[in-house]
Amino acid sequence: GRLWVVQYTQYPDPAGLKRLSRDKVWRVSYEKLPPPPPHIKGSPYRGTDKITIHEDTNNDGVYDKHKVFVDGLNMATSVAHDAKGVWVTNPPYLIYYKDENSDDIPDGNPEVHLTGFGLEDSHSIANSLVVGADGWIYGAQGSTVSASIIENLSKDKGPPIVSMGQNIWRYNPHRNKYEIFAEGGGNAFGVELDSKGRIYSGHNGGDTRGFHYVKGSYYQKNW
């Protein structure tokens, strides 16, 4: 068996903070949108998050082979593998590393498919990618972050798709189409599909431990 792991280290330098200018009084300006990876060593945007692969080569139940697929990420929260590469939520981005020969080495820099996942609260950022049998990529958005999503590769790019958190979203990579699948569910972390394609998510909402999401539905929110 093979295990893909995202190692998420708390973002040490929110949104790539840096001083841009000064005059008679100090004036600090903050970049609201860090650039997408890759980030060279020494870059203020380079993080310590990484995606690793662990393999049990002799089927004894112990992972004996370990490999880093990509490192230097910042706030990488989930990974999903398809036939030709690897999807990663690295807010504010959804990125895709092609690996068409399946050698566990990225074929190049990632494609940035979506931009605009909120960074207001690192405990609630976009997370939990899973590839559905319908070809859509599903993910969750927690309780205290917004989103203003731009479909970077769409030929019919319209205005940003805005949401205020607490939802399950999905993305069709063949049509470059993003949409809100269902709203509500609190601080959602974790997305699962059962054998019939039904979608579930867990959260930290007291006595309620999770929701079954139906397309287009609107569930309880905690604000």
Regions found by a protein language model. Give the residues of each.
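Beta-propeller blade termini and top-face loops
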Residues: 1-223
